[in-house]
Amino acid sequence: MSNAPFPIDPELTAIAIAYRNGRMIADEVLPRVPVGKQEFKYWKYDLAQGFTVPETLVGRKSKPNEVEFSATDETSSTEDHGLDAPVPQADIDNAPTNYNPLGHATEQTTNLILLDREARTSKLVFNPNSYAAGNKRTLSGTDQWSDPASNPLPEITDALDSVILRPNIGVLGRRTATILRRHPKIVKAYNGTLGDEGMVPMAFLQELLELEAIYVGEARLNIARPGQNPSLIRAWGPHASFIYRDRLADTRNGTTFGLTGQWGDRVSGSIADPNIGLRGGQRVRVGESVKELVTAPDLGFFFENAVAA
């Protein structure tokens, strides 16, 4: 990267790579997979092949039946996502001891890059079009889990059992998670004869649904135009998704609901800019090249409007 027009700073790049916002779940839901070039190919498998049993009986002198596993070659490309943060030279010169304005700008800019990825991931995962025709349901009225008379447990478990590979993780919006944890029928399952009021631990809900993990989307987005008062909405809406995730899957091997192709590492650097304030300054840039993909729509089930907004 030393020949790049915008100089890459190893120290700032290390900050950008190491930065983690624990309240964002995109990397868990659609894990990052390295790709060799910006344009890459990935395979879409015919899932029926893995479940269609051929004749395996072989006669004493006959030839065994042959099987062939085929896949559809799909082409995609990573997209560059980056932001600049101008840092006035005056801020650098007057920074207190142990405070690095460029490092701080890198962290804040990285957070926005990750927030944008969170929004893209939620739009993909919480989208009915990302799921096979029979693997989605829109709830309304008394069917929504926010209605105490609803019965989410059999609905969810029946949906999980209907997927060709039973989902192993759940993805919930914050309101969906909270309402499920205090739903009287789920609380009753936890309390037994002690009543149906209270709130069950998330670990109990995970165990009850036989999932490896449940991820709750916490991120909020400001949808107000520049100059207007902030208007915050949840990146992960009042929905619920249950998907099969294989962390070992990549663009060529393994079967998983979705993944994120990543070309290279996240990068960061700074360059002098004489047009920042009176004394100029440094322009900090953070970016990454990624593409979020759903590779197996059959391996998930989506409840749209699982709870009232």
Swiss-Prot record:
It is found in: Virion. Residues 64-83 are annotated as: Disordered. Probably the major capsid protein. Mutations in this protein confer resistance to host-encoded CBASS viral defense (in P.aeruginosa PAO1 transformed with a CBASS type II-A(GA) system). The above mutations are predicted to lie on protein-protein interfaces within or between monomers. Multimerizes. InterPro entries: Lambda_capsid_assembly. Keywords: Capsid protein, Virion. Its main location: virion. Changing W263R: Escapes CBASS defense in P.aeruginosa strain PAO1. It comes from the Viruses. This is Major capsid protein. Transmembrane segments: none annotated. GO terms for cellular component: viral capsid.
